[in-house]
Regions:
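PRPP-associated nucleotide enzymes
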Residues: 1-219
């Protein structure tokens, strides 16, 4: 919930005269942040999506077309919560941008006047090396784009990311013994030594095109 409060502070600072009518989370991981964001902005909180819990995380699915189709299978939209409103959508993060773009498209189809987007995590710009099958860096939507360019790419009328400093502060709260955090996907600074060509080789191996070639070879 502290992440929601930090996002609210950032929104008030960047856009004090905002015209947000309603805050809606993209279920389920952003729900607590969205709820506190709505409280701190003093705007209504609504749940505008019904989630199909049998569809997994789209960003780790192997092919782009499969990811696009899975968004609509995963989320059913409640038009009444969007029609005629300026909506602030909240998600835990933006990885490839596939989910964000499709959800914003769905919100506008449902009649939203404007669709704003808040990410409870900072912009993800680098691949993960420590256990998460993240996309290649070149496939991360924020890897070579400004915030404004990401907003345009996903179709948002305005986009706000949590700052890394605020994220660290919220994670430290109540845990003063924790001094350091692994933040390489945001900063590109890895905590372990890497071979000269390791990142380059990993980048190539994680690209959709290379994955498709491997699957074809297995067939």
């Amino acid at each position: 919930m502290r992440m929601g409060s930090k996002l609210a502070e950032l929104i008030k600072k960047k856009n004090p005269d905002h015209d947000i009518d309603v805050v809606i989370p993209i279920p389920d991981s952003s729900t607590t942040a969205a709820l506190q964001l709505a409280v701190d902005l003093n705007v209504p909180y609504r749940e505008g999506f019904v989630k199909n819990r049998y569809i997994g995380r789209t960003f780790i699915m192997p092919y782009q077309e499969e990811r696009r189709k899975s968004v609509r299978r995963k989320l059913n939209i409640l038009d009444l919560e969007f029609e005629g409103k300026n909506v602030m959508l909240v998600d835990d993060s933006i990885v490839r941008g596939t989910t964000s773009k499709k959800i914003i498209e769905m919100a506008k189809e449902a009649g939203a006047k404007k669709v704003y987007f808040a990410s409870a995590a900072p912009a993800i710009k680098y691949q993960n090396l420590y256990g998460i099958d993240m996309p290649a860096t070149s496939e991360l939507i924020a890897s070579n784009r400004t915030d404004e360019e990401v907003a345009k790419e996903i179709g948002a009328d305005w986009l706000v990311y949590q700052t890394l400093e605020d994220l660290i502060e919220t994670c430290k709260f109540g845990n003063p013994q924790i001094k350091e955090f692994e933040t390489s996907i945001f900063t590109g600074e890895y905590i372990t030594p890497l071979g000269e060509n390791y990142l380059q080789d990993l980048e190539v191996s994680r690209q959709d095109e290379v994955k498709a070639q491997r699957e074809k070879a297995k067939a």
